[in-house]
Swiss-Prot record:
PANTHER family listed in its UniProt record: CYTOCHROME F, PTHR33288
Major location (coarse): plastid
Phylogenetic placement of the source organism: Eukaryota, Viridiplantae, Streptophyta, Embryophyta, Bryophyta
Superkingdom, taxonomy of origin: Eukaryota
Membrane-spanning ranges: 285-305
Protein's recorded name: Cytochrome f
Cofactor note: Binds 1 heme group covalently.
GO CC term (a single one): chloroplast thylakoid membrane
Gene: petA
UniProt function note: Component of the cytochrome b6-f complex, which mediates electron transfer between photosystem II (PSII) and photosystem I (PSI), cyclic electron flow around PSI, and state transitions.
One Pfam family matching this protein: Apocytochr_F_C
InterPro entries the record matches: Cyt-f_TM, Cyt_f, Cyt_f_lg_dom, Cyt_f_lg_dom_sf, Rudment_hybrid_motif
Summary of subunit composition and partner proteins: The 4 large subunits of the cytochrome b6-f complex are cytochrome b6, subunit IV (17 kDa polypeptide, petD), cytochrome f and the Rieske protein, while the 4 small subunits are PetG, PetL, PetM and PetN. The complex functions as a dimer.
Amino acid sequence: MQNRNISYWIKKCVIQSISIVILMKIIAWPSISEAYPIFAQQAYEDPREATGRIVCANCHLAKKPVDIEVPQSVLPDTVFEAVVKIPYDMQIKQVLANGKKGALNVGAVLILPKGFELAPADRIPPEMKEKIGNLYFQPYSSDKKNILVIGPVPGKKYSEMVFPILSPDPAVNKEANFLKYPIYLGANRGRGQIYPDGSKSNNTVYNASAAGTVSKIFRKEKGGYEITIDTQDGRQIVDIVPAGPELIISEGELIKADQPLTNNPNVGGFGQGDAEIVLQDPLRVQSLLVFFVSVTLAQIFLVLKKKQFEKVQLAEMNF
């Protein structure tokens, strides 16, 4: 009996320990969606510069097309869709951080007018939730709820993303007005070429740091190369190329300073887009509807009056 109790308590302790470990992992492990915009969020107070350039372009050097679709106009305190499209060839593979090839991921930053923000979960219609899927959006910062970020997420599944947006109500939010507003989009597919500290990733071209002759190319065990260049003044320069890019030079070759040593492995890129949306006054819409109804009724009465007049004329002619 005592052995059974000991066995029971051992099993209980083991199960509790495993549960605690799993719970700690879930809490401590950061979401992949939260990891992507951290560079821009930490380095820049505002993701859009005064020139209109979105700061993501500092790391993603190649330009690629993006598209955004929003309604022409919305009413106050209304949930609507902003559809972001990031097209690319689904068959291509990108260089991963370990030098291997893998699928592309995508990410986006959506800059809304002040007052517009991410729609609360309880305001999003079920059909819109189906379009959104498992995407997790977050504001750029606590004081910039009108700027939303997402990514990285699998490009094959989310090359088209639906952002649920809540429009402001000028009756409640005094900063909002019934006007036409711009919306700005920045979106990327694939990894960047430069890290925020200015260092290169392994997803870009590597150039020779000096002119001379390539005397030795050493392939490292974990991938990448050490390229020894003998300069004309007798010095030896060693350029390090990480795993990922492919060499396009060979031993004995005479090269110039800044000459590419590798191909450009980047297959992704960053793009910007914009759209306009009108925050429509409901009273104006009602007035417009009343006007259209009035015009329609007036036309109907004119037609009826014309037919009545024609009947009178016809009766007089017969008389």
